[in-house]
Curated annotation (Swiss-Prot):
Organism: Paracidovorax citrulli (strain AAC00-1)
Protein name, entry field: Chaperone protein DnaK
Reported function: Acts as a chaperone.
UniProt lineage: Bacteria, Pseudomonadati, Pseudomonadota, Betaproteobacteria, Burkholderiales
GO function term, MF aspect, one: ATP binding
Compositional bias ranges of the Low complexity kind: 610-637
Entry's transmembrane regions: none
Residues bearing the modification Phosphothreonine: T200
Induction trigger: By stress conditions e.g. heat shock.
Keyword rRNA-binding annotated: no
PROSITE patterns, sorted: HSP70_1 (PS00297), HSP70_2 (PS00329), HSP70_3 (PS01036)
Amino acid sequence: MGKIIGIDLGTTNSCVAIMEGNTTRVIENSEGARTTPSIIAYQEDGEILVGASAKRQAVTNPKNTIYAAKRLIGRKFEEKEVQKDIDLMPYTIAKADNGDAWVEVRGNKLAPPQISAEVLRKMKKTAEDYLGEPVTEAVITVPAYFNDAQRQATKDAGRIAGLDVKRIINEPTAAALAFGLDKQEKGDRKIAVYDLGGGTFDVSIIEIADVDGEKQFEVLSTNGDTFLGGEDFDQRIIDYIIAEFKKEQGVDLSKDVLALQRLKEAAEKAKIELSSSAATDINLPYITADASGPKHLNIKLTRAKLESLVEELIERTIAPCRTAIKDAGISVSDIHDVILVGGMTRMPKVQEKVKEFFGKEPRKDVNPDEAVAVGAAIQGQVLSGDRKDVLLLDVTPLSLGIETLGGVMTKMITKNTTIPTKFAQTFSTADDNQPAVTIKVFQGEREIASANKLLGEFNLEGIPPAGRGVPQIEVTFDIDANGILHVSAKDKGTGKENKITIKANSGLSEDEIQKMVKDAELNAADDKKKLELVQARNQGEAAVHSVTKSLSEHGDKLEAGEKETIEAAVKDLEAALKGEDKAAIEEKTNALMAASQKLGEKMYADAQAAAAAAGAGAEAGPAAGQAASSAGGASSAPHDDNVVDAEVKEVKKG
C-alpha cells in the first residue's frame, strides 16, 4: 500500500505533507515552494495552469483566472455570501442548473469541486515526484465550520483529482495534531486553535490527554465563519485605494478588471509588508488612462491605517471564540496554549487581539502555513495503521435534524457531538391514511427548519392506511468519521426502509463526478494528443513540400486532369494543416499520396528511360525507387507507403 498523503486545500494557498517514519515532511512543489497558490488559469489553447504560473498571468487574464474557489464550494448561487462575491470577483460566478454557484470560464460552466481538483492534482503530482511512486490516497482538510454540503463537495474534488479521500479532517484539529504530537508535557492540556486563513475562520477548543501512553485529541467545541479571511482583508485595502484614487484623480477603478487584478496583487503585498514594517508605498504606474493621458497610482499605507480598515473584521473573530469557550464548558483561564494557524495570524493586530481575549501570548512554535497539512499527514499515518499511539475524537460543528409538523426543526444530533455517532428517533404521520412521508434534513441552530441549511430530502412510501399518529417511522441519523451524514427512515410496521447519504439537495451527481473524473484524465492525455498532432502536421507539411517540388519539375509530363487532381489534393492538405484536426490532416495526407501516384509512375518511367539511355540498366531499380519516393507516390516498400521522406529528392539531384 502506498503512502496516504496529507493535503491542506486552502482558499489562498495549499500545501502537501507526508510522514517518513516518525517525522513529517512538507514537500516542495516543482517551483521549489512549500506552499502553492490555490489559483487556476484556463488558457485560450485549453492549457490549465495551476499555482505560481497561474498567479503570474492573472493580470493579463483576469476573467479566466480563478482564485478563492473554496469560498464557493458546496454553496448555492442565491446565498448572500455568494452574491457578495459576484460583485468582487473578476471572473464570472454563474448559477448551475441545480442552483449551485458555479464559475463560467471561456463559455464553459465549471463546478467549484472541478476547479479545486486541479489544485489537488498538483498536490498529488508534487508528492508523486518526491516519492517516485503513484499516490492514490489522501487525507484532505476542511474548515471545522464547513457544513455537510461543503464537506461532500471537497470529497468530490478529491475523487475528480484521482484521489481516494480516506478522511476529511477539520483544519484546527489537524493543527492540534501537528502541535501536540511532539510535545513532551505530561498531563491533560486544553488548547485553543485560532485559524484565520485566506477565506475562512475557525476556532476549536481541543483537549490533549495522555491515556496509557496514547495521545488522545478530543475536540470539545468548534465555531467559526466560513466567509471571513484574508481575501476580505485584501478587499478592504482595495476599496480604500479605489476611494483615494477617485478623490485624487476623479477616476473610478472599480469597473476596470485589469486594474482590479493589479490592485489585488498590490493589496496582498502591502498587507504582508505591513506585518513587519510601519508603512509601505503602493506604487502602480499606468494603472489607467483618460483623455489627458496615462494615470499613475502612488499611495502610502501605514500599519495604523490598515488596522483601522480591518478592525471590524478582526473583531468578528472574537464572538466565535467566546461561543467555543462557552460550548466547551470551560473558562478562558483553563486554556493552556493558544495556537495560531493561517497566514492572516502573522498580522500583529490579530495576535494582539488574540492575546487580549485569551489572556496569554500565542505560541510561536507552530508554522501557520504548514501545520494543517502536517496534521493531515499524521492522520493519514494513523489511518494506514502505521501509527497506533494517536486517537482523534472530532465533533460535528452544527446541529442536524429534520422538519416536523409546523415547520419546526427537531434536532437529532446537537452541535459539538463527538463523531462518528448514530441517533434514532421514532416519528409518526400528521394526517389520517397518509401513504408517504417526506424526510427533510436540515443543518443549523435555528428553531424554524427553513431558516437552516436544507441538506437533502427523500420519501418513505407505501405506508399502510392508518389513523394520524399510528404508523411508527424510525428515522436514523448516522455521521461517519468524515462528518458526512447518512439518513434512513424505516416503517416499523412493514419493515420498509429508504436511506440516503446526504449529498446536499444539489451538489454533484454521481454521473457528473464520473464525467469530471474522465475530463481530468483527458487533460492528462492532452499532451499526448498535442504531440500526435505535431507529428501528423510535420508529416503533412513534408508531403506538401515534396509533392509541390516534384510537380514543378515533372508536372508537364502529366495530363491536365491528373495535374489538377494533385494540385487540389495539395490545397486540401494545406487547408487541413491550418486546423487542429489530426484525423483530417492524416486523411488529406493519405489522399495526396494516392493522388500523386501517377506523378510517381511518370518519374519512375523517366528514370528508367534515362538509365537505359545511359546504358546503366542495372542501376535503374534503385534510382526509380528514389524518384517514386520523392514524389510521395506509392513506394515499393510496403511499410513506408504513408511516410514521405522529403530529404530523398536532394540526394537524387546531388
